[in-house]
Design a protein with these regions (language model features):
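A short, compositionally biased
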Residues: 1-2, 177
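Catalytic cores of peptidoglycan-degrading enzymes
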Residues: 73-202
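Polar/charged, compositionally biased leader and regulatory segments
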Residues: 3-90
Length: 202
C-alpha cells in the first residue's frame, strides 16, 4: 500500500494508506491523422505554446466548491473507441499516451455536462484539440471535452449535471467525429471511467 496525506476543507490533514495496483495499458495505432498535427511545422510552435498556456490557466484555479460530490454521468452515449493511458502511434509516429476516453458519436451529437461546475475555457480552435471546453467541478477537479464542432456555453457560466454544453465534432488532431473526455485533479491526470465507477451519480 501507498501512504497519502489528505488535506480536508477545514484545514486538517489525514494520513491514509491505500493499495495501488499495477495497470496494463494498450497500444493504439491511428492512421489518417492530419500530418501537420503529427509533426507540426515550425510556424505553428508559438500557437501550440499559447494554446497550452490557456489550458494551464483554465485548470489553475482551485475553489472550495464541491460540485463533484454529486457524482458523474457519461457526457454522451456511445461505444468507447479509445481508452485512458493507451500508447498512441499517429501515422506510425509514437506520441504521448492518450489521457482521455474516446466515445464514438456522429458529428453534431449532443454533449452533456457529466457534473455541475463553472466553465473555465470555451475555445473553438486549439491546435491539437480543436473545439475545447473545460469545466471546473471544484477543489481542482476539472473535465475537458475535445474535438468539438460547436460549444453551447460561455466562459464563466455555470452548468448543471445533464445540461447541454457542446456538439461532437472532429476538429484538431482527429480522424473522425468523436468525443474525447478528459479529467484532471490539479496537475494530475485522472481516468474518467474510474470516476464514473466510484462517485455517486444518483
Amino acid at each position: 500500500p501507498s501512504t497519502f496525506i489528505i488535506s480536508t476543507p477545514n484545514g486538517t490533514d489525514i494520513e491514509e494508506q491505500y493499495p495501488v495496483a499495477e495497470r496494463e495499458y494498450k497500444i493504439q495505432r491511428v492512421e489518417g491523422v492530419p500530418q501537420k498535427t503529427v509533426k507540426p511545422p515550425a510556424e505553428q510552435l508559438q500557437r501550440i505554446r499559447s494554446d497550452s498556456a490557456l489550458v494551464v490557466k483554465a485548470r489553475k484555479e482551485v475553489t472550495s466548491v464541491t460540485d463533484f460530490l454529486e457524482g458523474f454521468i457519461k457526457p454522451i452515449d456511445g461505444p468507447v473507441t479509445g481508452v485512458y493511458g493507451s500508447q498512441r502511434f499517429y501515422n506510425g509516429v509514437p506520441k504521448s499516451p492518450h489521457y482521455g476516453v474516446d466515445y464514438a458519436a456522429p458529428k453534431g451529437a449532443n454533449v452533456i455536462a457529466p457534473a455541475a461546475g463553472v466553465v473555465r475555457l470555451a475555445h473553438r480552435d486549439l491546435f491539437y484539440s480543436g473545439g475545447t471546453l473545460i469545466i471546473d467541478h471544484g477543489h481542482g477537479l476539472s473535465s475537458s471535452f475535445l474535438h468539438l464542432s460547436d460549444i453551447l456555453v460561455s466562459e464563466g457560466s455555470r452548468v448543471e449535471r445533464g445540461d447541454s454544453i457542446a456538439l461532437v465534432g472532429s476538429t484538431g488532431r482527429s480522424t473522425g467525429p468523436h468525443l474525447d473526455w478528459r479529467m484532471n485533479w490539479r496537475n494530475v491526470r485522472v481516468d474518467p471511467e474510474l470516476v464514473l465507477e466510484t462517485l455517486p451519480a444518483q
